Amino acid sequence: MNLRLPTRRETLAILAVAALPRPAHAVGLRVATVDWSVLETLLALGALPVAAPELLQFREVAVEPAVPPSVTDLGLRGTVNFELLLLSRPELIYSSSFYVSSEPRLTRIAPVERFSIYAPGRPPYEPAAAMMRSIGARLGRSDEAERYIAEAEAEFAALRERLTPHAQRPVIPINLGDARHFRVFGADSMFGEVLKRLGLANAWSDDTSYSAMAPVGLEALARVPDAWIALIPPVPPGALEVLAGSTFWNAVPSVRAGRLLQLASINPYGGLPAARRFARLLAEALLAKGPAHG
């Protein structure tokens, strides 16, 4: 019997398919998630979930890791489409402390494992790393998890060294509520954790609530006159235009001195991928400004 050897094109196609990230169920489990930090983590490990929520918005807000089109969009995070979730036939559902109220319905579909990264007064980085290790162990990707965590620490260390000329000036990471108010990310936010790893001080020392405190008036920025302002999207429509013509805004010391950094979108409730994205975007913005502003 004559056996036909594969052509070069067929061989390349086979190799290309083999190089694609494996779905999570390739190691025995079809996994779904209702939480973005878990989604980031699964994608970073190359373990594709069968379903996850708000994928269009995830691609705009979290941006990375990229979500393949094969992942089913479950709709809103707080009120996922349970019919679509059921049709996705998950064997395991990952959730978080944000979605405890949904668990009675989720457990009717598949077993639920819950993570808690964000809690008042508790820095989230180590819980995020622990979550990555737990997911990696569950899905047979412990090596990938350890490699990713090591790469993150190495990236922070490298950026910290590059940012040494900026280390004497603090950073205040904020998100605009409107043209008169902002939310600030404190020490118990992921952004606050990253600042420490980059050797940068958080200019905001008051208490916050694990992501960002309730909106405060822009006049509070005058309390941190020496800081860099790291502006994190989303920005309300028209807010920047209003601020550009605001005498008060332009009199804020940091703004007047040109120390306003407008960053690209980042998930404020993210896991390690969001932490790395924030570190990279902030470092790029600071380095682009140069030490003259430092």
What are these regions (language model features)?
Residues 29-30, 34, 228-294:
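Structured C-terminal subdomain patch of bacterial secreted/periplasmic proteins
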Residues 30, 111-177, 204, 268, ...:
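Extracytoplasmic substrate-binding proteins
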Residues 35, 39, 43, 82, ...:
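Extracytoplasmic/secreted envelope proteins and their assembly/folding machinery
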Residues 39-44, 58-61, 179-183, 239, ...:
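Short, solvent-exposed loop/turn elements at domain surfaces
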